[in-house]
Amino acid sequence: WIIPFIPLPVPILIGAGLILFPTATKSFRRMWAFQSVLLLSIVMIFSIYLSIQQINSSSFSQYVWSWIINNDFSLDFGYLIDPLTSIMXXLITTVGIMVLIYSDNYMAHDQGYLRFFAYMSFFSTSMLGLVTSSNLIQIYIFWELVGLCSYLLIGFWFTRPVAANACQKAFVTNRVGDFGLLLGILGFYWITGSFEFRDLFEIFNNLIYNNEVNFLFVTLCAVLLFVGAVAKSAQFPLHVWLPDAMEGPTPISALIHAATMVAAGIFLVARLLPLFRVIPYIMYLISIIGIITVLLGATLALAQKDIKRGLAYSTMSQLGYMMLALGMGSYRSALFHLITHAYSKALLFLGSGSIIHSMETIVGYSPAKSQNMGLMGGLRKHVPITKITFLLGTLSLCGIPPLACFWSKDEILNDSWLYSPIFAIIAWATAGLTAFYMFRIYLLTFEGHLNVHFQNYGGKHKTPFYSISLWGKNGIKKNSCLLTMNNNESTYFFSKTKYPIDKNERKMTRPFMTIAHFERKAVYSYPYESDNTMLFPIFVLGLFTLFVGSIGIPFNQDGVNLDILSKWLAPSINLLHQKSNNSMDWNEFLKDAVLSVSIAYFGIFIASFLYKPIYSSLKNLELINFFVKKGPKRILWDKIINGIYDWSYNRAYIDAFYTRFLVGGIRGLAEFTHFFDRRVIDGMTNGVGVISFIV
């Protein structure tokens, strides 16, 4: 029971210190960061110990305190330690510690350094409380605290109007889901008379078996519970807050997208799966929402210029895979992908933070510039360690063996064939799209030359390679001199106009370690690699990405069972009355793996063809000419590509639809209500008063 409360003293003491002793608290601010890491490390040790116990003993542990209000109603508070809890606790603590260490350097120059660590520790407390909850009321309390923390962290730089609007959007969108969750909790309490998970599942199964419930009402309550998970895990149609959540600091994006907020929705569905699985229509709904989100997230990631927003839509798509697996009843596959994706995505977000951190010294502290992939390029020469680790995370998400996400995604893809061929085709096609958009991000960021020196910030292009489109370099221009190689024509790849580097910029000279509390005096003409305190967490997450997939590989041939994940999840799988298939047909596995990896490599090839800089592959000019012939077919193809690009870049116009019809309609209703209240209701009251005064 103490696990959620171990990190809690940090936000309390920081808040009290800033109120009572602000100067002293700020002067010892590094001490608070150390305490945050220390306390979360203690929780991690507890979590690992509990996980080892779970693997060895395959048991549940639950303790409940009853608060009796009267003879008919009581509130129970306690903790539930089962495989799902231990997995989530291990994820939250390991990723959280890496993010806190990384943040010490990343936020070193920020005025809100202490506030940031207070919010982060409170976020960890809220999420740990959520995953250890033993009943729905406790879940709902910590669910709201997680939403509050995300609101505070997304709007951390609240003086920026964009960040203020983003945190409000996330908060309001999640309130829709939270209201549904509350109604669903009350509905199931009315049906079963209990909030406790074990009692709830047992009573509900008996009611279903004896046909003593109204299936329409039960289905409605289950849908309302699921709506809460849809909003929190950014599933269609309540996904609109996720890309805007990138307005917060990058370490927050890593934590939200890897192990906390978006994982909470997956956790809730996994926790309530014994309830959902006896209501077939809900399982169909979960799988349908999952497959729609898989495809929508992947297509919306195709044309994003902001590196963090591209990764955000990637998260949305991968969460769709997890939701699809849960809807198919593949409990093990969903949690396996939750684990592998968490480390890979944390690695990618911290890597993007390292890139942004290095770009800020050139383009300034404007997210529109420092996160714009159109201003990047050629960073492999300047940030080699970040490049290697980012490539590792990219390959993992693409599903390339032997990296982590290959094993988990392959399980989901194989299970989808058994569930529905249509869903399987969409899921496999999206695996190719995943490889395409992830390598698009990688190539635009690390390959070619640094584009920032060939731009002006007035919005005019000084080079044909600035604009990003689905085709890469603003499409391939039919009249471009790159497409003809006549003897009398010269070939050039950049504008002939020279753009001198600012006179204040000078060659990069800096020590490998920097003192965090002093401003950098130099302005660099090129990006530079991050400091050790930022590279260490990235390196550790890279190791996780390499090796964490091995816990779910069923190496259990010849009577030797080394499938750690199946041992870990055995109690939960038994509760779901599922047969755990610990054996693997390696011939079948290799056949499916070859197909999935081939699709991934095809996506990588297409991305390389479209986004690899033309000037680095002159030998491909004839191939490019083949695809860029004039004619009606080419014009039609351009229109199709531009339509897809506009649809993707404008977020499938879903945000515009919500803004125009939902937000506009609600604001119109609010204005009418305000007018009616002030002019009609108050007018009647004031009129009676005036008449009384005259009489």
From Swiss-Prot:
Bilayer-spanning residue ranges: 1-21, 32-52, 81-101, 117-137, 139-159, 177-197, 211-231, 250-270, 278-298, 319-339, 346-366, 388-408, 417-437, 535-555, 594-614
The annotated topology with respect to the bilayer is:
Multi-pass membrane protein
Catalysed reactions listed for this entry: a plastoquinone + NADH + (n+1) H(+)(in) = a plastoquinol + NAD(+) + n H(+)(out); a plastoquinone + NADPH + (n+1) H(+)(in) = a plastoquinol + NADP(+) + n H(+)(out)
BP-aspect Gene Ontology terms: ATP synthesis coupled electron transport; electron transport coupled proton transport
Q: Which GO terms describe its cellular component?
A: chloroplast thylakoid membrane
Q: Which top-level enzyme class is recorded in the Swiss-Prot or TrEMBL entry?
A: translocase
Which GO terms label this protein's molecular function in UniProt?
Answer: NADH dehydrogenase (ubiquinone) activity; quinone binding
Write down the superkingdom of origin: Eukaryota
Annotated coiled-coil positions are none
Compartmental location: Plastid, Chloroplast thylakoid membrane
What keyword terms does UniProt attach to this protein? Chloroplast, Membrane, NAD, NADP, Plastid, Plastoquinone, Quinone, Thylakoid, Translocase, Transmembrane, Transmembrane helix, Transport
Enzyme Commission (EC) number: 7.1.1.-
Q: What does this protein do?
A: NDH shuttles electrons from NAD(P)H:plastoquinone, via FMN and iron-sulfur (Fe-S) centers, to quinones in the photosynthetic chain and possibly in a chloroplast respiratory chain. The immediate electron acceptor for the enzyme in this species is believed to be plastoquinone. Couples the redox reaction to proton translocation, and thus conserves the redox energy in a proton gradient.
Q: How does it assemble?
A: NDH is composed of at least 16 different subunits, 5 of which are encoded in the nucleus.
* Family classification: Belongs to the complex I subunit 5 family.
Q: Which NCBIfam families match?
A: NDH_I_L, PRK06590.1
How is this protein named in the record?
NAD(P)H-quinone oxidoreductase subunit 5, chloroplastic
Report the source organism: Capsicum baccatum
| Gene label | ndhF
